[in-house]
Structure formats: C-alpha cells, structure tokens
C-alpha cells in the first residue's frame, strides 16, 4: 500500500491529486495548480544553498535521455523568449529525496545507507513524462502515475531514518516532477503560463526507472551538477516489463 499524501503549503501543488494512478487526473491537477500562480520566484534565491555547498540526494538521472531529451529541447526552444535557465542535456533528473549536507553525513552513514538500499522493496517501473506544467519557480513535466514514485520515496525515507541521516521532506509532501527550465528572476506568471499552454498537446515520453542514484549535488552556473556516488538497481518484475502505451 502506498503512503498517503497530505496537503502541505511548502509543497507544490500544496494538495495532492485525487488519484495517484490516473494520468488525466494528475496532469490536470498539476496544470490547474500552475494556472493559479500569479508570480514566479527566482529559483536560485533559496535559503540554505550556495555554490560552495554539497548535498547528498537520491535522484533518478538519465545518462542516455534519448526521446526525453528531444521532447525537452523542443519545449525549451518554444520557451526561449522567456529567458529562463534551461536544464542542460546532462542535467535532466527527477529529484526523489534529500539525504543531507555532505558535512552532516559521515562516510560510515553513506555506506550504511547504501547497504540498506541494496534490496529496496520497490520493483523497477515505468512512468510517463507529460508536457507541460510548472511551479512557482520552474517549468516542468508532469509524471504519471505517482504511486510507484511515492513508494520509492517512502522506501528511501525509511532507509535514511534507519541510517540516521538528516533526511528531507516526508513522503506525505512528495510531489513528483521533472524540471526543464528554472525561473531566474521574479516575474509575472501569466506570460509563462500562456507560453506553456500550447505545448500541452505534445504526447508523453516513457521513462524507465531501473535504478536510483545517490549523488553529491552542487549548484554551478545556474544549473545543478552532481557526482554519482552509486547507482542502486531496482529489482525487475513481470509488471515492470509491461510497456506503457
């Protein structure tokens, strides 16, 4: 059973969708939340981050993004006039969970965490990346379904608690997404929303989650860069091999 998601004002959207399985419900929910944004913030103006800091995160990365990259670059070209910071080809990722600042997590804790995640109770799975919606600080793809991503987040969060790392937001506040461009200034949101809307008719792109990556994350030149500590394989299953239409 997947953990329940709660309304959380620090999350976006603050309330979860009515269904964690139904793509139409999730995509529409993301879009309606973005339509209600009046002002977008500078994504890089964030307390607790500087170019000198390093933090451990669980992410899903895309060494060979293929069709995802084609769809991303198509959308980025259509939004180029907005002057946002596009996510580069080698920077595409799905953020799953913060582990903690490098200076707050010992090498022994990292090794313990990796040992605990060698047999996660989550099988490999497929999701779809749907163009296009956004948040208060970014333009991003909606991901569907949420349920396997929520289960993965919960498993990683449980492992982190067992390893005694600082950890990140609880699973109840998790909102899966895939960012493709960051707002680099405060701006009126309606112009961004209007530019995004025509891209919503593009078909979704299938993504295959067969690994989860523990990375050392940093900010560099208004983008995110990372060093992969280890890619942890997710066990295969008959269900995970079922292709999504």
Tell me what each language-model feature is:
Residues 2-245:
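Histidine-dependent nucleotide/RNA phosphoesterase domain, centered on the 2H-phosphoesterase fold
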């Amino acid at each position: 059973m997947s953990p329940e998601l709660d309304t959380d004002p620090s999350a976006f959207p603050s309330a979860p969708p009515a269904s964690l399985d139904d793509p139409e419900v999730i995509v529409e929910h993301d879009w309606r939340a973005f339509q209600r944004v009046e002002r977008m913030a500078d994504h890089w103006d964030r307390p607790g981050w500087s170019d000198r800091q390093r933090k451990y995160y669980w992410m899903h990365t895309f060494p060979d993004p293929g069709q995802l990259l084609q769809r991303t670059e198509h959308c980025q070209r259509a939004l180029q006039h907005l002057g946002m910071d596009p996510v580069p080809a080698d920077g595409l990722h799905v953020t799953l969970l913060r582990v903690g600042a490098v200076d707050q997590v010992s090498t022994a804790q990292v090794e313990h965490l990796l040992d605990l995640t060698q047999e996660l109770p989550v099988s490999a799975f497929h999701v779809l990346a749907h163009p296009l919606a956004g948040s208060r600080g970014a333009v991003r793809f909606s991901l569907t379904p949420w349920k396997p991503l929520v289960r993965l987040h919960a498993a990683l969060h449980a492992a982190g608690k067992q390893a005694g790392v600082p950890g990140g937001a609880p699973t109840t506040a998790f909102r899966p997404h895939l960012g493709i461009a960051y707002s680099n200034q405060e701006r009126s949101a309606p112009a961004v929303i209007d530019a995004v809307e025509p891209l919503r008719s593009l078909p979704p792109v299938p993504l295959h989650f067969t690994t989860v990556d523990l990375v050392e994350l940093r900010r560099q030149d208004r983008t995110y860069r990372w060093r992969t500590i280890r890619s942890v394989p997710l066990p295969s299953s008959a269900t995970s091999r079922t292709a999504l239409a």
